[in-house]
Amino acid sequence: MGTSCIGSSEAIMLGTLAMKKRWQKKRKAEGKDWHNPNIVMNSAVQVCWEKAARYFDIEEKYSFCTSDRFVIDPEEAVALVDENTIGICAILGTTYTGEYEDVKKINDLLIKKGLDCPIHVDAASGGFVVPFVNPHLVWDFRLEKVVSINVSGHKYGLVYPGVGWVVWRSPEFLPQELVFNINYLVADQASFTLNFSKGASQIIGQYYQFLRLGKRGYRSIMLNLTRTADYLSAQLRFLGFIILSKGGGFGLPVVAFCLDPDNGQHFDEFAIAHQLRERGWVVPAYTMAPHSEKLKLMRVVVREDFSKSRCDQLVCDIKLALQVLGEMDKNAMESYQEYVQAITRELFHGNVLSLINGHILLIIL
């Protein structure tokens, strides 16, 4: 059973709330304290997980990334589980590198240690990729401990924002006190949402894509995206970058990469990102998750409209960016980076001011 959502953020909120309520019911029935729930997750989770934990008063217990591991450590995650743990979050396609976490290993360790702890799979991106590119990967309800899964329709589900989905293994994992039954809208309906009024166009769009593309269509598109991502990885590796994402269908159609520190460049990934922005490309540069934030990296998310010819154009512009930055001496580079930081701050404050002014204008109107 499941429900549609505005996106995976709402879906994750609902999944977390269901795990918390189920844990509380169990603790109350056993006559034990039920006021200090916690949840185990990787430090590279999307920010909506932190929001869910704080909004619902749940302690966050992290398995931190390292300099060479950017996903959850199954052994460490299971070791963090105690009697107050409502569940473990496993990510099928991390935000930082697009890598898949080992859901099966977490599941097997929980069973081996006899721990009654559910798993929620955050398949916001990977849920519409893995079944078509790597169908033999076991991450879903085939695993005993997986009780709920969320997926975004507006990512690789190929629908416009915002639509997401959350599904539960069976009705027992969705406490009925969270479900509201109403009959004043023509017929009896069950409702479990955090949002209220919303349109149905996104749901219709998802239904249309299912009918129009089918399994064969989705498989064709996802395989093509994977091939394009692998091609881009090869081109960037040839330019001297270190590729941090997984290729060959073992990760999302995402290319995460960084400069090789052994090459001794006097510029960083943020300078490259700014150069690319001047050429019309928005390729984000950012630092890795907590405890590994010294690592700077960039990320290209391969979408359906990112063809091989556009990929070649991006590679060409990256070459030009490297050439321009490489011709600057150290003093010129320091001045350039100060300029980039100043422009970034100005753009940020300008956007915030525009948003504020826009809201004020709306209020006045």
Predicted regions mapped to residue ranges:
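PLP-dependent aminotransferase-class I/II
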Residues: 6-9, 32-108, 135-138, 144
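Conserved beta-loop-alpha segment that forms the PLP phosphate-binding cup at the N-terminus of a helix
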Residues: 1-32, 47-51
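Catalytic PLP-binding core of fold-type I/II PLP enzymes
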Residues: 99-134
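Short acidic, glycine/serine/threonine-rich loops at helix termini
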Residues: 15-17, 50-55, 99-102, 129-134, ...
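Secondary-structure transition/capping motifs at alpha-helix termini
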Residues: 22-34, 56-61, 69, 83-84, ...
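Non-catalytic terminal extensions of PLP-dependent enzymes
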Residues: 17, 213-365
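Active-site C-terminal subdomain of aminotransferase-like
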Residues: 120, 128-253, 257-263
